[in-house]
A protein has these predicted regions:
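Cation-handling catalytic/transport regions enriched in His/Asp/Glu
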Residues: 1-237
């Protein structure tokens, strides 16, 4: 259940990083489904505003992401530390009159992933906004998010909130283990898929002359080393 997952994730961050989340209905939001939370450090120091935008609606794109509306920076003259405003955006199924918003395991993992990105922004403490939060080298930007993902299969974390929405039964350890055991399914294919993206990027962005050839043939040659399934004709990656 979404509300329980949110409590679990916020509680995890509180235990790991000694921070607290306080809902503030006085902060303006851009849609009635959005909630705003102020984030505070262990000594009560204000850290950030976090917006949660969990449900689909007309005009909202699909997927999940973190957005920084206002980055962190420090005024060199006054020393004032301007704190960030960030949002985590999902497309979880809305609750109905008869059923709360229920999440799949993948959606819980996605929640943790985007929440990890938001923590990267929330903990920023730099002089320049251009170097704070997720404004880092791209090979590092996914580290905080993927670190947080790992807790999705930690029983100690799951036992703080993961209960059946009707019976209250705690998630069985056997089910958690089955999720862990299945985590390597198709992992080699997923790896090759990412390799193919890299091969194609390198093929296009290492060129130093205009391209005037056959795009489909060029792309096919670029990622042919990582291709294991039949090619769908008349398509490009």
């Amino acid at each position: 259940e979404l509300s329980k997952v949110k409590e679990g994730v916020f509680g995890l961050a509180s235990r790991l990083y000694d921070i607290t989340f306080k809902k503030n209905p006085g902060i303006p939001v851009y849609h009635k489904d959005v909630e705003a939370y102020e984030v505070f450090d262990k000594d009560g120091t204000y850290l950030a505003v976090l917006y949660t935008d969990f449900h689909p609606r007309a005009g909202k794109r699909s997927g999940a992401w973190m957005t920084s509306y206002k980055g962190q920076w420090t005024d060199e003259k006054s020393g004032e530390n301007s704190r960030p405003h960030v949002s985590i955006v999902m497309n979880f199924t809305k609750p109905t009159q008869n059923k709360p918003a229920l999440l799949t395991f993948d959606e819980v993992e996605t929640f943790l992933h985007e929440f990890g990105h938001s923590l990267h922004e929330i903990f920023a403490n730099s002089t320049y906004e251009s170097l704070s939060g997720t404004n880092v080298y791209w090979d590092f930007v996914e580290l905080p998010s993927q670190f947080m993902e790992n807790f999705a299969i930690e029983k100690e974390f799951l036992h703080t909130f993961a209960r059946h929405y009707q019976t209250g039964e705690l998630i069985p350890d056997e089910l958690v283990q089955r999720i862990v055991d299945s985590s390597n399914f198709n992992v080699a294919y997923a790896c090759l898929r990412q390799v193919s993206f890299g091969l194609l990027d390198m093929a296009w962005y290492t060129r130093n002359t205009p391209f005037e050839g056959d795009v489909k043939a060029y792309e096919k040659k670029a990622w042919d080393k990582a291709q294991i399934l039949p090619v769908v004709e008349e398509t490009c990656m």
